[in-house]
Amino acid sequence: MRVNKIKIYGSDSIGLFGYIANDIAVLSEVISKEEEKIIKDTLGLEGIVKTTIAGTPTVGSFIIGKKDLIIVPSSIYEEELKKLEELFRVEVVDVVNNALGNNYYYWPKKNLLFAAEDTKKEAKLLAKKLNADLYLIDTDIEVGSSLIGNSKMLLHNPDIYIDIEDAKPVTLNMGDKFVGAAALLNDKGIVVGSKTTGIELIELQDLF
C-alpha cells in the first residue's frame, strides 16, 4: 500500500478537504496542483472533480456515500451540485446535521453507516438512502471525523468502542484521534497529514 504525507491549505486535517470513493474523488478547490498529484498518484485515482460545498473548502465535511451515490446537504450551491454530477449520482438531503461527513461514516466493506446515538433519526434516513445497515455508537464525538476505512480495515478513534473484528484503533498526526479528518484512504493507498509520526506510519503499514 502506498503512503504519503502532505499538508493542505496549511492544515494537517487533510481528510476535511476531500472525499474518496475508491478510484474517483471530490477534492477541494484550495488543493494545489502539486498536492493533487500526490493524492492522485498515491491513491491511483482515475477521476477527480474539484469544487467547494456551501461555498466552503472543506468538502469532505459535507459528503457521505459510496461510489455510485453520494449524499450532500441542501446548503450546497447549484453550481457545486452540477460539478459533482459530472462524476457521481448525487442526492440532496435537508438535515439538521448538514456536516454529513463529520457526523456520519459509511463503510462499504460491511455496508454499514456509523452514527452517534443522538443522531439516530437522521441516521435512519441516510442509511435508507444508502441501502445500508445502521451501526449506532454511544458517543458525543463526531463519528465521521473519527473513522476511515477501505476493503480491509476500519481505522477508528481509540475513544470510540466498535465491536467489529476489522476495526482497529489508531492515531495520526502525532496523536490526533480524529483519523477520518486526518487522512484520505482507498484500497491502493493512504495520504495522511504531515504531522503523522514514523511510528504511526509503521503501525498503519502493519495493519494493511
UniProtKB/Swiss-Prot annotation:
Keyword Protein biosynthesis: yes
Protein biosynthesis recorded as keyword: yes
Transmembrane segments: none
GO molecular function, one term: translation initiation factor activity
Highest taxon of the lineage: Archaea
Disulfide bonds: none
Signal peptide interval: none
One of the GO biological process terms: cytosolic ribosome assembly
Matching InterPro entries: eIF6 (IPR002769)
Pfam families registered for this protein in UniProt: eIF-6
Gene3D superfamilies in the cross-refs: L-arginine/glycine Amidinotransferase, Chain A
SMART domains named in the record: eIF6 (SM00654)
Keyword terms: Initiation factor, Protein biosynthesis
Similarity comment: family membership: Belongs to the eIF-6 family.
Function per UniProt: Binds to the 50S ribosomal subunit and prevents its association with the 30S ribosomal subunit to form the 70S initiation complex.
Protein name: Translation initiation factor 6
